[in-house]
UniProtKB/Swiss-Prot annotation:
UniProt organism field: Pseudomonas putida (strain W619)
Compartment annotation: Periplasm
PANTHER family xref list: PROTEIN YCEI
Protein family according to the UniProt entry: Belongs to the UPF0312 family. Type 1 subfamily.
Protein name: UPF0312 protein PputW619_0484
UniProt keyword list: Periplasm, Signal
NCBIfam families named in the record: PRK03757.1
Protein backbone atom coordinates (compact mmCIF):
# COMPACT_ATOMS: atom_id res chain seq x y z
CA UNK A 1 0.00 0.00 0.00
CA UNK A 2 2.80 2.41 0.90
CA UNK A 3 4.55 1.68 -2.41
CA UNK A 4 1.35 2.46 -4.36
CA UNK A 5 0.86 5.71 -2.43
CA UNK A 6 4.45 6.73 -3.07
CA UNK A 7 4.18 5.84 -6.77
CA UNK A 8 0.97 7.86 -7.11
CA UNK A 9 2.55 10.80 -5.33
CA UNK A 10 5.64 10.60 -7.56
CA UNK A 11 3.48 10.39 -10.71
CA UNK A 12 1.36 13.35 -9.57
CA UNK A 13 4.45 15.40 -8.85
CA UNK A 14 5.91 14.50 -12.24
CA UNK A 15 2.71 15.51 -14.04
CA UNK A 16 2.50 18.80 -12.17
CA UNK A 17 6.15 19.48 -12.87
CA UNK A 18 5.80 18.73 -16.58
CA UNK A 19 4.05 22.05 -17.13
CA UNK A 20 6.63 24.01 -15.20
CA UNK A 21 9.81 25.53 -16.59
CA UNK A 22 12.77 23.29 -17.27
CA UNK A 23 16.22 23.94 -15.85
CA UNK A 24 17.22 27.54 -16.44
CA UNK A 25 20.60 29.25 -16.52
CA UNK A 26 21.23 32.07 -14.02
CA UNK A 27 24.11 34.55 -13.88
CA UNK A 28 25.24 35.48 -10.38
CA UNK A 29 24.35 39.14 -9.73
CA UNK A 30 27.47 40.53 -8.07
CA UNK A 31 27.16 43.93 -9.73
CA UNK A 32 24.02 44.79 -7.77
CA UNK A 33 25.62 43.67 -4.49
CA UNK A 34 23.31 40.66 -4.41
CA UNK A 35 26.04 38.05 -4.03
CA UNK A 36 28.84 37.59 -1.52
CA UNK A 37 31.72 35.19 -0.83
CA UNK A 38 32.47 35.75 2.86
CA UNK A 39 34.90 33.97 5.15
CA UNK A 40 35.85 33.85 8.80
CA UNK A 41 38.73 32.32 10.68
CA UNK A 42 39.41 32.01 14.40
CA UNK A 43 41.98 34.39 15.87
CA UNK A 44 43.79 33.05 18.95
CA UNK A 45 40.66 31.08 19.80
CA UNK A 46 39.16 34.26 21.29
CA UNK A 47 37.43 35.89 18.33
CA UNK A 48 37.04 35.73 14.56
CA UNK A 49 38.54 37.61 11.67
CA UNK A 50 35.86 38.21 9.04
CA UNK A 51 36.49 38.97 5.41
CA UNK A 52 35.20 38.72 1.88
CA UNK A 53 36.35 38.26 -1.69
CA UNK A 54 35.19 41.24 -3.73
CA UNK A 55 35.93 40.00 -7.26
CA UNK A 56 34.15 36.83 -8.36
CA UNK A 57 31.81 35.64 -11.06
CA UNK A 58 29.68 32.62 -11.71
CA UNK A 59 26.51 31.01 -12.90
CA UNK A 60 24.17 28.23 -11.95
CA UNK A 61 21.52 26.04 -13.50
CA UNK A 62 18.34 25.65 -11.45
CA UNK A 63 15.13 23.68 -11.82
CA UNK A 64 12.94 23.68 -8.71
CA UNK A 65 11.25 20.48 -9.93
CA UNK A 66 14.62 18.68 -10.14
CA UNK A 67 17.08 20.24 -7.68
CA UNK A 68 19.46 17.29 -8.17
CA UNK A 69 20.01 18.42 -11.78
CA UNK A 70 21.29 21.81 -10.61
CA UNK A 71 24.87 22.95 -11.23
CA UNK A 72 26.98 25.88 -10.07
CA UNK A 73 30.33 27.31 -11.05
CA UNK A 74 32.09 30.18 -9.24
CA UNK A 75 35.45 31.77 -10.07
CA UNK A 76 37.11 34.30 -7.79
CA UNK A 77 40.20 36.45 -7.81
CA UNK A 78 42.18 35.67 -4.66
CA UNK A 79 43.80 39.14 -4.63
CA UNK A 80 40.34 40.63 -4.04
CA UNK A 81 40.32 39.46 -0.41
CA UNK A 82 39.37 42.14 2.10
CA UNK A 83 39.23 41.98 5.91
CA UNK A 84 39.02 45.69 6.76
CA UNK A 85 42.73 45.77 7.73
CA UNK A 86 45.20 46.60 4.94
CA UNK A 87 48.32 45.15 6.60
CA UNK A 88 46.56 41.89 7.42
CA UNK A 89 45.18 41.68 3.88
CA UNK A 90 48.68 42.16 2.49
CA UNK A 91 49.97 39.35 4.71
CA UNK A 92 47.13 36.97 3.79
CA UNK A 93 47.75 37.70 0.09
CA UNK A 94 51.50 37.03 0.45
CA UNK A 95 53.38 33.78 -0.18
CA UNK A 96 53.00 33.10 3.58
CA UNK A 97 49.34 32.26 3.02
CA UNK A 98 47.30 32.55 -0.22
CA UNK A 99 50.21 33.52 -2.49
CA UNK A 100 47.88 35.42 -4.82
CA UNK A 101 50.64 36.19 -7.33
CA UNK A 102 51.26 32.49 -7.91
CA UNK A 103 47.61 31.43 -7.48
CA UNK A 104 45.48 34.37 -8.68
CA UNK A 105 42.24 32.41 -8.98
CA UNK A 106 40.15 29.95 -7.02
CA UNK A 107 37.30 27.99 -8.57
CA UNK A 108 34.39 25.82 -7.45
CA UNK A 109 32.53 23.57 -9.90
CA UNK A 110 29.72 21.38 -8.59
CA UNK A 111 29.66 17.68 -9.38
CA UNK A 112 26.53 16.59 -7.47
CA UNK A 113 23.51 18.06 -5.70
CA UNK A 114 21.64 15.94 -3.15
CA UNK A 115 18.39 17.20 -1.63
CA UNK A 116 18.37 17.01 2.16
CA UNK A 117 15.06 18.76 2.83
CA UNK A 118 12.34 20.87 1.25
CA UNK A 119 14.69 23.84 0.78
CA UNK A 120 18.10 22.35 1.59
CA UNK A 121 20.73 20.35 -0.25
CA UNK A 122 24.31 19.18 -0.10
CA UNK A 123 26.23 20.62 -3.05
CA UNK A 124 29.43 18.69 -3.68
CA UNK A 125 32.07 19.81 -6.13
CA UNK A 126 35.70 20.41 -6.88
CA UNK A 127 37.32 23.41 -5.20
CA UNK A 128 40.63 24.58 -6.61
CA UNK A 129 42.50 26.80 -4.16
CA UNK A 130 46.24 27.49 -3.87
CA UNK A 131 46.85 25.18 -6.85
CA UNK A 132 45.18 22.20 -5.16
CA UNK A 133 41.84 20.68 -6.21
CA UNK A 134 39.82 18.84 -3.56
CA UNK A 135 36.19 17.71 -3.24
CA UNK A 136 34.17 19.98 -0.94
CA UNK A 137 30.53 19.81 0.17
CA UNK A 138 28.49 22.94 0.87
CA UNK A 139 25.29 22.92 2.94
CA UNK A 140 22.94 24.93 0.73
CA UNK A 141 19.59 26.60 1.41
CA UNK A 142 17.18 27.69 -1.32
CA UNK A 143 15.93 31.17 -0.35
CA UNK A 144 13.33 31.63 -3.08
CA UNK A 145 12.70 32.57 -6.70
CA UNK A 146 10.40 34.80 -8.72
CA UNK A 147 10.00 37.92 -10.79
CA UNK A 148 11.96 41.07 -10.02
CA UNK A 149 10.78 44.72 -10.46
CA UNK A 150 12.83 45.09 -13.68
CA UNK A 151 11.04 42.43 -15.71
CA UNK A 152 13.48 39.60 -15.02
CA UNK A 153 13.45 36.51 -12.85
CA UNK A 154 15.76 35.67 -9.96
CA UNK A 155 16.63 32.81 -7.64
CA UNK A 156 18.67 32.96 -4.44
CA UNK A 157 20.70 30.55 -2.34
CA UNK A 158 23.00 30.48 0.66
CA UNK A 159 25.75 27.87 1.11
CA UNK A 160 28.28 27.20 3.85
CA UNK A 161 31.25 24.93 4.37
CA UNK A 162 34.37 24.66 6.50
CA UNK A 163 37.75 24.16 4.85
CA UNK A 164 40.86 22.65 6.38
CA UNK A 165 43.55 24.95 5.01
CA UNK A 166 46.21 22.23 5.31
CA UNK A 167 44.27 20.24 2.69
CA UNK A 168 45.10 23.00 0.21
CA UNK A 169 48.74 23.40 1.24
CA UNK A 170 48.01 26.64 3.12
CA UNK A 171 49.52 27.41 6.49
CA UNK A 172 47.43 29.78 8.59
CA UNK A 173 48.92 33.23 9.09
CA UNK A 174 50.27 33.69 12.60
CA UNK A 175 47.88 32.85 15.39
CA UNK A 176 44.89 31.87 13.31
CA UNK A 177 43.11 28.56 13.04
CA UNK A 178 43.74 26.03 10.28
CA UNK A 179 40.01 25.93 9.49
CA UNK A 180 38.20 28.57 7.50
CA UNK A 181 34.42 28.98 7.30
CA UNK A 182 33.02 30.01 3.91
CA UNK A 183 29.56 31.54 3.56
CA UNK A 184 28.37 32.14 0.00
CA UNK A 185 25.18 34.06 -0.74
CA UNK A 186 24.08 34.25 -4.36
CA UNK A 187 21.20 35.80 -6.20
CA UNK A 188 21.09 34.86 -9.85
CA UNK A 189 19.40 36.60 -12.77
CA UNK A 190 17.71 34.19 -15.16
CA UNK A 191 19.27 34.33 -18.61
CA UNK A 192 16.95 34.52 -21.60
Amino acid sequence: MLKKTFAALALGTALLSAGQAMAAEYKIDKEGQHAFVDWKISHLGYSFIHGTFKDFDGNFTWDSAKPEASKISVDLKTASLWSNHAERDKHIASADFLDVKKYPEAKFVSTAVKSTGEKTADVTGDLTLHGVTKPVTFKATFNGEGKDPWGGERAGFNATTTLNLNDFGIKGPGATSQTLDLDISVEGVKQK
